[in-house]
Regions:
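Fe(II)/2-oxoglutarate oxygenase catalytic core
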Residues: 2-289, 293-341
Length: 341
């Protein structure tokens, strides 16, 4: 998440850090009333005293950058961003991703914005009834822990998500700090994991229907897969990050499937331990800004049966190719290239 060649906190890291709690500092004194308030022990902070629609000054932007690096995800409430303001804010932190394909609910004229609105655009997709689509999302890893676009060779560096319409209850999102999860492993397991790589593939864990399944055919025809290090070095903080999730990771390279399955289950359980997580209750006008290189998140699965819309808008910032502890970069397998969406 860089801008003008500078790291998100304005410094360059040596990349030698092995995990734990080395962070860019946060400063509540960057402007009148601006405060960064942690909300959990390892991850998450709420920032107050900032109007994101009012073109925050450079000092405030720097404080937000530092807070994202320190706390991995930051939250703002009561914001009045529109689509143009959302994109303009994102550009202060990096280059927004322009998606070639978006859902019908996404706003025209703003190709950087993707709108997630289950009730608006999922019914009838790929020959499925709306309730059938939601049922399979609930009962498969499509609702599982993930980073955004993790099967790409260059997953987004960060995501800025804005709430337009939220249900009166439910719909919370949960994030986990993967740097803290890595640091919490025992030293022998860290040393072992440092050497591993894994295949990340779109659609892992998807539950197909019997017979002709149009969505499975779609996934097979539009494969995206990369081999990533199982531990990546964060390009700005130098922290080692446990690069696992329940959606994209298919198998650890060089291991048998039973071995891979057992190790991935152990690592994912570590990555999602409650002490490394934070849960956010959305309100209209809420904004969450997270480091996609150091977190995974869990989309809510408790609203599909409710007759309440949940409309969210997101902008993702272009990322870099992950690098492992040995200095070796990720490698594309199929359907992906740096900067090509």
């Amino acid at each position: 998440m860089t801008t003008g060649g500078s790291d998100m906190d304005g410094t360059r890291s040596s990349g030698r850090h092995t995990g734990g709690e080395r962070h860019a500092g946060t400063s509540p004194g960057t402007g009148p009333g601006v405060e960064v308030r942690p909300v959990a022990g390892h991850i998450g902070a709420e920032i107050t005293g900032v109007d994101l629609a009012d073109e925050p000054g450079d000092a405030v932007i720097a404080a937000i950058r530092a807070a994202v690096l320190r706390w991995k995800v930051v939250f703002f409430r009561g914001q009045r961003l529109d689509h143009a303001g959302h994109v303009a804010l994102a550009r202060r932190f990096g280059e927004p991703v322009v998606l070639p394909r978006r859902g019908k609910a996404s706003p025209s004229g703003f190709p950087e914005i993707e709108t997630t609105a289950d009730r608006l655009e999922l019914g009838g997709r790929f020959g499925m009834e709306h309730d059938e689509w939601l049922r399979r999302r609930r009962h498969t890893l499509l609702r599982g822990w993930h980073c955004d676009h993790g099967a790409r060779i260059d997953p987004p560096a960060a995501t800025i998500l804005r709430a337009q319409t939220v249900p009166p209850y439910g719909g919370d999102t949960t994030w986990s700090n993967l740097a803290a999860a890595y640091a919490g492993l025992s030293a022998p397991v860290r040393e072992f994991t440092d050497r591993l790589r894994a295949e990340h593939r779109l659609g892992v864990g998807y539950l197909p229907r019997s017979g002709d399944d149009a969505y499975v055919r779609h996934l097979l025809d539009h494969q995206t897969a990369s081999e990533h290090p199982l531990v990546r070095v964060h390009p700005e903080t130098g922290q080692r990050v446990l690069f696992v999730n329940g959606y994209y990771v298919e198998q650890i390279t060089g291991l048998s499937r039973p071995e891979s399955r057992a190790i991935l289950e152990m690592l994912l359980e570590q990555a999602t331990r409650p002490e490394y997580t934070v849960r956010f209750r959305w309100e209209q006008g809420s904004v969450a800004f997270w480091d996609n290189r150091a977190t995974i998140h869990l989309a809510p699965g408790d609203t599909a049966h409710l007759d309440h819309p949940r409309i969210m808008h997101r902008v993702m910032l272009a990322g870099e190719v992950p690098v492992g502890t040995d200095g070796r970069a990720s490698e594309p397998i199929t359907g992906t290239a740096p900067g090509r969406w």
